[in-house]
Amino acid sequence: MCGIAGLFGPDGNDAEMAHSMASLLAHRGPDGIQSWSEECPHGGVGLGHSRLSIVDIQGSNQPLHSDSGCVLIINGEIYNHQKIRDDVREYPWRTQGDGEAILAAYTARKSSEDWLNHIDGIWGFALWDPKAGHLILSRDPIGVKPLMRTITSEGTLLFGSESKSLRAHPGHIPQLD
């Protein structure tokens, strides 16, 4: 069980905030907290990850980066990661971990809509594609892995594996829905 957290929008280019958000999820991943951020036309994107090492203990620190510039954080398990490795041989694999299969499948996609249908597993992830200017948030079809989200009054999207990670951001005001 890992924890992911991040922000996207006017004040999203903030690795320290992403780190603070992920730190509130340290109980989900005691093997290290990493963060990353980047400026973008929408303001910025910041991603944080609290890691529990199960597969590829030394080599799969997150965020994961692809050669095309995409960045991924994931909480989950990809059951068919070996099949994806076999199918997407042209992808320059950097780790032995199962999460990188998401980056490979996205990079090798033939359509912007069907690539996720080829993933078998349980997950909550955030994938930043800087060329498209898109942040993709996804949960597995059954919703086993949690992924909470909210938007601040300034228009920044906050997300995390648990709602407690959202509290790190000063613009988060909890409200009943």
Regions found by a protein language model. Give the residues of each.
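Cysteine-centered catalytic environments shared across enzyme families
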Residues: 1-177
